[in-house]
Amino acid sequence: MRELEERILKDGRVLPGEVLKVDGFLNHQVDPDLMFAMGTEFAHLFQDAGVTKILTVESSGIAPAVMAGLAMHVPVVFARKHKSVTLIDDLYTAEVYSYTKKTSNHISIAKKFLQADDQVLLIDDFLANGQAVQGMFEICDKAHVKIAGVGIVIEKVFQTGHQLIADRGVRLESLAQITSFDGDRVHFASEDTQA
């Protein structure tokens, strides 16, 4: 998605450890117009997948997931990282390691929000090593739902997450695919297709 790539080049910042900081429009301050465009693009990409529900992990996956849900007219469920006093129902849980925060979290979803006949689209802000997606796969497996696909805002194709999804035979659509960082320069897969 060219608009997203341009925004990454304009406002993103490469940090040590191959971390891309995009807090100016995605995961701290949110640009609603860009989010709407991303949600619309996800809806277009998965229009024939029979999606009945969207699943994400709090918190940075919520905005793109909600915009996709709005465009697709389906509910959005987000896995909570911290158990609240209101989260008392039977739960599906999984452990997820955060690449950027270097911590593990238990994510939880109330069982009543995932039914065996659901076709679930997983959406997240980043795909690096695939730990958040792996946690969502685990929850979907426990709920016996069909995974319609995975939608990622920004994918680092040089890390292991892509292969993790491919090994499951699940369709993956990423709006921006980063092939490498060169100092503070970001290189996209779309550059290779334009050459």
Curated annotation (Swiss-Prot):
Binding site for 5-phospho-alpha-D-ribose 1-diphosphate: A128, N129, G130, Q131, A132
Superkingdom classification of source: Bacteria
EC id: 2.4.2.22
Keyword annotations: Cytoplasm, Glycosyltransferase, Purine salvage, Transferase
Annotated metabolic or biological route of this protein: Purine metabolism; XMP biosynthesis via salvage pathway; XMP from xanthine: step 1/1
The keyword Glycosyltransferase appears for this protein: yes
Gene Ontology CC entries for this record: cytoplasm
Compartments reported by the entry: Cytoplasm
Catalytic activity as recorded in UniProt: XMP + diphosphate = xanthine + 5-phospho-alpha-D-ribose 1-diphosphate
GO molecular function, a single term: xanthine phosphoribosyltransferase activity
Binding positions (xanthine): L20, N27, K156
Any one biological process term the GO annotation gives: xanthine metabolic process
Record flagged with keyword Glycosyltransferase: yes
InterPro entries: PRibTrfase_dom, PRTase-like, Pur/Pyrimidine_PRTase, Xanthine_PRibTrfase
Family classification: Belongs to the purine/pyrimidine phosphoribosyltransferase family. Xpt subfamily.
Job of this protein: Converts the preformed base xanthine, a product of nucleic acid breakdown, to xanthosine 5'-monophosphate (XMP), so it can be reused for RNA or DNA synthesis.
Binding partners and assembly: Homodimer.
NCBIfam families noted in UniProt: PRK09219.1, XPRTase
Listed name of the protein: Xanthine phosphoribosyltransferase
Origin species: Lactiplantibacillus plantarum (strain ATCC BAA-793 / NCIMB 8826 / WCFS1)
Gene name per UniProt: xpt
